[in-house]
Amino acid sequence: MVTDDRPAEELDVWFITDMVLCNFECPYCCAYKVITTKKVWHEQDSYDRFLRITERLTQVPYKLRMRMQTLGEPLVSKEFLERTGWLVSHDNISFIELVTNASLLSKRLKIITDNGGDLTKISLWATYHHTEIKMDKFLDEVQFAHDAGAFVVVNSLAFPDTIDTVEELYKKCAERGLRMNVDPGYKDGGGEYDEEGGALVPILEVPGGKERLYAMTANQNVLEANLRAADTVDGEECSAGGDYFIVLADGRVGPCCPLLSQGMQLGNMLDENYTLAPGKKKYSVCTVDRRTPILGHLPLVGDHFRRRWPCKNKEDFGHLKVIRENEVRSPSLGWFGG
């Protein structure tokens, strides 16, 4: 069933690279199998593939709204930042969003501008890691990037043992006029979603936890869609494969993370005969099998993160029609706060 035949003017792209160097050692890192302080790229040909894929992205005949994700920390790699500056300078790139721990923004953001990048086309998803950096230091780095012209969102996950810290961070962001996104932290190993979400989202098991989480959410509609999508997306309409695509480090292209996990590959960015283009329709009913591990396509992620949840990534469920039809578009694949 397809319900919308409007042509896409822009494409949303979630490009996951295998850059693995990081300056943090978070004990809960989902990429713990490969994260390292010793090398920049996971494989010998990773950087070459990265260059070729980004070259192909500049040739796509559509505007691209892109989250370019690393498994490590993007700010530690000079060559990654140089390429980011080069890539975002192209006319068909609406913005590039980087997922960062923010610790090096004041020292390294200049590399992007030195290589042709306009910071007003740079978006930063700055996640606070409370075990690795002091809150005020983190906020000073975020403030620097915000004042320099980048679109910045502070991000944090609410767990029972972090909720007090998250609330403190939320208050300080409000005082500074910074955007903040608070997502529910998921339980390791998965589990079925029940009526109250308690089997999936630990913060909802805590007395008053639901109220505290909802008080900080930037968009209640998105939060509720998040919890639904983690359980089932049966019957939900989505723009995955219409105007949203995932690109992996080896060039594979899929409609979204869950569908690519099921083997629905649309092409490969390393194939010169393939062109990334919108689907015939914007929306179609989701066909994700809830029994498929949604990260099964990504062997770099730890085994205990291979959860059998249909749709848990915000990049993916953010393209459900129930969200897309009500959202204010921003230069981010994760921010829906207006």
Give each language-model segment a name:
Residues 1-8, 12, 32, 36, ...:
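Flexible mid-to-C-terminal extensions adjoining Fe-S/redox cofactors in radical SAM and related proteins
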Residues 2-48:
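Canonical Radical SAM [4Fe-4S] cluster-binding loop centered on the CxxxCxxC motif
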Residues 19, 23, 235, 283:
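Residues immediately within or flanking Cys/His clusters that coordinate Zn2+
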Residues 51-69, 77-173, 179:
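Radical SAM/AdoMet-radical enzyme domain recognition
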Residues 26, 98, 251:
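Conserved, mostly hydrophobic/aromatic
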Residues 28-29, 240, 285:
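Short, cysteine/histidine-rich loop/knuckle motifs that typically chelate Zn2+
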